[in-house]
Structure formats: structure tokens, C-alpha cells
Amino acid sequence: TFNLSIVEEFFNVVTSNDVKPVDGTVDLEAGRTERLKLFEESLLYTTEREFFDEHFCRYPVIRINFKEVSASSLGTFYKKLAASLHSTLDRWLRQLEGADLDTRAKASHQRVVEYHDSMELHLEKTAQHWELQESDAENIFVRLSNLLHDVYMSQYVVLFDEYDKPLKAIRGQPWEKAAAEMYTSLVNKIFKDNNDLKCGLLVGVYKLPLVDIGSGANCVHFLPLTVHGYHSGLNDDRGQPAVLHNSLVDMFAHDGTEVRLLVEAARGRYRRISYYSTEVIMTTLTKWYDGYAFGGTGGKFNPYAVAMFLRELEHGNVNFATQDYWQDTEN
């Protein structure tokens, strides 16, 4: 999810909500300059400059998260999918508040606002699946797609978090086939023959056969978090043990070098943290938070836990600094 946020910051256009008005004027270029600070020392900026300049802040980003999708009934499944996409639509409407739109875009925006408000009431009242059409989730996406096209006249990027959650939720249910067909239709709508789509990134815990379920998303490239030569215990599409590459192993969590940099920066900035030597802090952090392993590679630190530890240390809460922070989250 954190990595998706970085991808979103890179591709997403700057909106009026990203910039503080000065004398009633919104300077979007100033917002772009401010966002550039996030990437100025990145490898992408320093080694892939042509790509960077071509795509930075260029496309509206549609970010979808199906974390809340559950399946106690077919009706619940329809509603949760629609509600998740409605939240995505809601975020974009808020981003476009105060935007300087031309006549066509303004009319499109008003139509979508009215649709958004009516759908919000509909979702609040819906209790049974026959009150919510299975096409409602698709309709919400289409409305958002059309709006972004009218406003920006460009393609968009789709970031799809927990794409596997809906199919896992319906597995073994008596209405699994109907739900799978509905979800397949939605994936079709987003990824197949969509001329407004620049590219998409789907993230999930389990590799699911999107192509096999007939989604039409035939140009899918899998990027597994597995070290080359490491047998994950999973089988590939031919039933053979999966031996996969490691292109993303170093892209998640922190290693010891990165944590040491954070500790040294914190010691230089916060007086209470400076009471403790770098080695003392590193020993504690290593004992508590370096237990993560990706693709058979261990020694990874939990970024959230490290940040929370340093925050507690900054406030002088030495006795409470070491906790299992991650277990209290939903992730």
C-alpha cells in the first residue's frame, strides 16, 4: 500500500486540493515543484530522466482498494464492490473541488456529483441484493472514467489494491459463480479494450488467474516477491514448482542500512533520542522489528513499527517504545 502511494504521487496530476491558494490563486506548477522534492534524489529521477520527465504528474490516477469487500451474501458482495468504487469516485470529486473547468468538463462534473449523491443514498438504504443492480459497480467506474476524460482529455492510470480479496471472499459460496461473473465483468470494464487506460498496477497477496477467469486482461505481467531460484511452494500455471525472479524483493520494508540512516537522522533532530547511541537503538530495533522475510530473504524491518518506536522515543516514553505496533492495525 505504501508503494502504491509512491506510484500515485509520481503519476497523479496536481489538483487544486494539493496547493494552498495564494491571494485566491491556485498555482498548480508550484504544487508540481513541491511534489518533485519527493523524487529528486531517487534513482528514477537520476538514472531514468527521460522517462521521469515524460510521465511525472502527467495522468489522473484511479486508486481502487477492495480491502472492505466481504461476502456474507451475494447482495453484500455487490454492495461492497459498489461502495469501494463509490469511495474512489468520492475522492476524485473532492480533488476537483474548486478546479477551473471548461464548460464541457463543468457539466460532466455536475452530472457525476448528482449521480454520486444519489448512489450514496442508495448504498445507505440497500439491504437486499435485488435492490442493488450488479451493474452498479461498473456504472460507478464508467462515470468516473468519463469524468476524468472530460476534465483532463488524457489517459489515466489505475492502481488496484487487494484485487484478490473479492475472489477469495466468494470462494466456496453457493452463489460463487454469479459473483465471479460479476467481478469478471468489472475487471473487463476496467482493463479490457479501455482506450482511456494508460496502464494499471494490481497488487494482491495471492496470484490469481485473471486471464483464466476470462477477464480479457491478456497483457498481464506478474511481478512476484520471490527470490530467483527460491521455491515458494506455489505452482505455476503449468503445475510446476514456481521459481521466480526477485525484481521487487528490495522494494519493500527497510534493510539495516536504511534503518540506521533513520536513527542517525532522528538523533540529530530530537534531543531525547540523542540520549541513546545509534548502536543501542539499532540493537533494540533489530531485536524487535527485523523479523520480516520476502521471498526467502530475511532481515527486513517493519517501517511502521520503526517509525512508531522513534516517535515514542522522541516523546520520552522509553518504557513504551518497544511494542508490537503492527498487530493492532488491520494489515
Language-model features, listed with the residues they occupy:
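Conserved P-loop NTPase "ATPase switch" module shared by AAA+ and STAND
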Residues: 152-177
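Amphipathic alpha-helical segments of the small helical/lid subdomains adjacent to P-loop NTPase cores
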Residues: 210-217, 223-309
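Structural recognition of the conserved hydrophobic beta-strand(s) that form the central parallel beta-sheet
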Residues: 157-161, 181, 185, 198-205
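Substrate-engagement module of ASCE P-loop NTPases
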Residues: 89, 140-151, 177-198
